[in-house]
Amino acid sequence: MDRTAAQLRIQELHREINRHNYLYYVEDRPEITDAEYDLLLRELQQLEKEFPDLVTADSPTQRVGAAPLDKFNQVSHRLPMLSLENAFNEGEMRDFDERIKRYLGLPMAKEIEYVCEPKMDGLAVELIYEEGSLTFGSTRGDGYVGEDVTQNLKTVKSIPLRLHCSPPPSLVEVRGEVYLGLAPFQKLNMDREEAGLPPFANPRNAAAGSLRQLDPRITARRPLSIFCYAPGLVEGYEFTSQSQMLATLPQWGLPVNPLIKKVAGIDAVLAYYREIGETRESLPYEIDGVVIKVDSFDLQRDLGEKTRSPRWAIAWKFPPRQAVTVVEDIVPQVGRTGVITPVAHLKPVEVSGVMVSRATLHNWEEMEKKDIRKGDTVVVERAGDVIPAVVKVMTEKRLEGAELLAVPAACPECGSEIVKIPGEVAIRCLGLTCPAQIRETIIHFASRHAMDIEGMGDKYVEQLLRLELVKTVADLYYLTKKDFMRFERMGDKLAENLLNAIEASKHRELSRFIFALGIRHVGEHTAKLLASAFGSVEHLEKATEEELLSIREVGPQVAQSVRTFFRNPANREVIERMFAAGVRPAVEEKRLGGRFTGKTFVFTGALTRFTRDDAKNMVENEGGHAAGSVSKKTDYVVAGAEAGSKLDKARQLGVNVLTEDEFLKMLEG
């Protein structure tokens, strides 16, 4: 291939790969397989290797991260990134609405058009595109001066390196919030604790810490996302309103929050705030309120700014997810990987509508740093599904004689030696037969998202261990009715149900089986990737590190962990014993010709005919995709009782709305 042909093909590959990146990371509806994507990327890499002078800054191959920096350079924003005034109740919101009308000389009966947006709890950044290419990115900083984090922002998969429009405006400055979703946050903290590193306190800190890494290669390994929400300077294109701007940005490849809504009047603003508050716990990311902006840019200019904040916008904060309680005890807890964690037993207190009686203290260094002691009065915080944590000690209320819990001299469960590996903050039990590790391993194996052995809860697992009926998960498949009849308060029918549940688990999907094995760093999503790539446990067991790394989203940490797991003879023996007992993981295959091929479904409200997990599986088994939010790409919304903002969004966009019965009829054909 000559240079001219290579240049044309490289440009074509840029467009194609960028489009598939957008579909995968922003729309969450891929059109090609990972293998097909990898072929495109490899072709581009090969062409760039042959013609290095054709490598451009906005090439998809340049996302992996540049060399580490010594420090971040400070940069000035051409337009200040002002902070927002806060409101904390309905009265303050009505005052805001009245102030705007008085300032503009409008009658109080006039309904102002507002745009309401979920207030993301992340890190504000500015992206600068020149002639369509991302050339610069910075943090908000103090609103006037931020830090140059261009190379790190280029690793965020949902940020396009080039705008999806032709011709692009000559200059586009856009502001957005970089965030880390709750599921990636929990996995990141789990990985850090297993690696002996201190966990992040919350998703916001994790996002900020990830984006401010001097080594962009570390940022590239963190699954950060972005929602854009405001323009800076724009040349070559004119926006007339906030709503028009938010409708245009996705056409350029820049993601915006799908829950944003344009409303008329303050009463509609109050209703939106209540709706978002009701759905807050089910969102896959953290929000801490709602941002309300006057929609018209002409009115925004008329209103102007105060010293630190615009007059035309306000942030209405949610009530804090914190409460004050007392630490009644601190108990060491052993996890399935041997990490020993101090756990605070609390006087029960309600936080965000949930009764909290325990909170993780993460590790001894963290506990000592926060100076948390038995009997202390503390502030606990609960964020989404994240385990409650102690965020502050009220030392002025400390009881005399309160002492820190000492690091245990031996494992509190089995008495084995404990170690603190250099460079780690975690302490670990080295006991190969530690009952706590075995218990947690079996509980994980039997859990709903793993082998789903119905009825096999914590109490039964503890009895199995106490009676020495199991030592590994493989032993579950050799249990008899006679074994279960040794349990306390066990009847014939219940024993038979447990045996039937164990039998039914023998043919679970391969991805569930891989997840159930408890391989470090392999969660549900990664297990699905591995199952899809290798098709059987035998093939996965023989996979080389190179083969593992060829899978999209599988990095060195996961690849090494998988190889380490299968190199362990004890692990292979457990798997062989399960296979000998009749365990045959089934390979799940998406039906390319299924009823729902190419269709995207969203489920909302209280479902009574099936669970959300069941619904997702039904859609995916028929070749479709189940998404978490409604957009113009959504084909169907299935609405249960008390459906809220997602149903409103569907009606606003003209998306087909189905009842549960109508969905089941579609499924049956």
From Swiss-Prot:
Gene Ontology process terms (BP): DNA repair; DNA replication
EC number(s) given by UniProt: 6.5.1.2
Domain BRCT: start-end pairs: 591-669
PROSITE patterns: BRCT, DNA_LIGASE_N1, DNA_LIGASE_N2
The keyword Manganese appears for this protein: yes
Gene Ontology molecular function, alphabetical: DNA binding; DNA ligase (NAD+) activity; metal ion binding
Record's keyword annotation contains Manganese: yes
Amino acids binding Zn(2+): C411, C414, C429, C434
Tree of life domain: Bacteria
Residues annotated to bind NAD(+): D34, A35, E36, Y37, D38, S83, L84, E117, R140, E177, K293, K317
A Pfam family reported for this protein in Swiss-Prot or TrEMBL: HHH_2
UniProt keyword list: DNA damage, DNA repair, DNA replication, Ligase, Magnesium, Manganese, Metal-binding, NAD, Zinc
SMART domains in UniProt: BRCT, HhH1, LIGANc
NCBIfam families: dnlj, PRK07956.1
Protein purpose: DNA ligase that catalyzes the formation of phosphodiester linkages between 5'-phosphoryl and 3'-hydroxyl groups in double-stranded DNA using NAD as a coenzyme and as the energy source for the reaction. It is essential for DNA replication and repair of damaged DNA.
Protein family per UniProt: Belongs to the NAD-dependent DNA ligase family. LigA subfamily.
Name of the protein described by the UniProt record: DNA ligase
